[in-house]
Structure formats: C-alpha cells, structure tokens
C-alpha cells in the first residue's frame, strides 16, 4: 500500500516525529511524508507515531492508497522522488 502522512505537531515534538518518519518514508515537504509500505510497516508507523504525539494537542492524518498515485507538483518540488530501476 502507498501512504501519505500529513501532520501538525507541537514544536516540542515535531523533530522527533520527523526523524521517526524519515526512517520509514520519503520526505516530500514540510509536515508531509509518503511511501510504499507493507501492512506490518504501516502498523509500526502508526504505533510509533502514537508513542510520539500528544493526542490532545497534535494531529496526524494518514491517507492509504493502493499504489503510488499520479501527482502534479505546482511550484518547486522540495524533495523529488527519484525512480530507481
């Protein structure tokens, strides 16, 4: 499955969340990560985020898709995804 993670996290926790997500997904732009994951990886990511955030203050949205969507970037692409063959 392909996931897109979008988050709005308190300044005190944002670097920990970003560092954690960089281990699993591709950084796209501020507060957005995406990537192909297995179901087990998806569950690990959800559990890891759950341990890092404060549910009363922070917000994380995870979009689950069947495969990498076609996307169109308007303006500067901050961190292009390179296709590796």
Curated annotation (Swiss-Prot):
Domain of life from the UniProt record: Archaea
Gene Ontology terms describing biological process: defense response to virus; maintenance of CRISPR repeat elements
One Pfam family cited in the UniProt record for this chain: CRISPR_Cas2
EC primary class: hydrolase
Example GO molecular function: metal ion binding
UniProt function note: CRISPR (clustered regularly interspaced short palindromic repeat), is an adaptive immune system that provides protection against mobile genetic elements (viruses, transposable elements and conjugative plasmids). CRISPR clusters contain sequences complementary to antecedent mobile elements and target invading nucleic acids. CRISPR clusters are transcribed and processed into CRISPR RNA (crRNA). Functions as a ssRNA-specific endoribonuclease. Involved in the integration of spacer DNA into the CRISPR cassette.
Family designation: Belongs to the CRISPR-associated endoribonuclease Cas2 protein family.
Record text on subunit structure and interactions: Homodimer, forms a heterotetramer with a Cas1 homodimer.
Protein name: CRISPR-associated endoribonuclease Cas2
Taxonomic path: Archaea, Methanobacteriati, Methanobacteriota, Thermococci, Thermococcales
